[in-house]
Amino acid sequence: MANFFPKWTNWIPLKIVIIVGVLGAAVTGGIWYYFTPKFTRVGYMPTQPVPFSHTIHVEQLGMDCRYCHSFVEVASHSNVPSTQTCMACHTQIRATSPKLEAVRESWKTGRPVNWVRIHKLPDYSYFNHAVHVNRGVSCYSCHGAVNAMTAVWQDQPQSMSWCLDCHRAPENFLRPPAEIFNMNWVPAAGENQRDIGMKFKDAWEVNPPVTCGGCHR
């Protein structure tokens, strides 16, 4: 029987297989990258060079957030605790623990511990940490119940829509100044968050920007 198709058509099935394979790999790679916690961030909990439990330090020992994150009230960016901060206690407490080897090495060499960053806003987004903390926004609102975390993860998406939810209705999040760093605070019986928030919103004249220029400068 005569061959009605040219010889080059013999390669079509192989080409189809290759194209499908490449597209499949691209889709699989895209899903793996863009939909993993490291990219979407919520739930992202990387392994750190030193295991650090906020549950032990905050809940059991009663340490205030500001002891380690000492610049949160005055700086635009919250600081990662220095090795000196850690060693203020750990030269005496659990001074030989294997878990703290990286801290002791940093103390000895002067090189910082290579902590893995968890919360990271894009460079095109402006955020001032001190402004929020000094106007009634608690650590809890952005970072979740860190006091209950044996290992820190990202609790909130910190996306534009998430930011705007607060900027459009800050009364749903503002709390008394004395309770900013109290991770267990809840409104007292007979009070509600919105009424408390409205009081501070009016007193502090809180009017967060909701236009592009407010956060993209």
Q: How would you label these PLM feature ranges?
A:
Residues 1-10:
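N-terminal Lys/Arg-rich, disordered targeting/topogenic segments
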Residues 115-133:
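Short, solvent-exposed interaction modules
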Residues 101-121:
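Carboxylate-rich helix-loop segments that flank metal/cofactor sites and access channels
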Residues 28-46:
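Aromatic-capped interface at the extracytoplasmic side
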Residues 15-32:
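Hydrophobic membrane-insertion alpha-helices, especially the h-region
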Residues 45-100, 128-217:
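Sequence context surrounding c-type heme c attachment/ligation sites in exported
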Residues 35, 48, 111, 123:
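Glycine-rich, flexible loop/turn motifs
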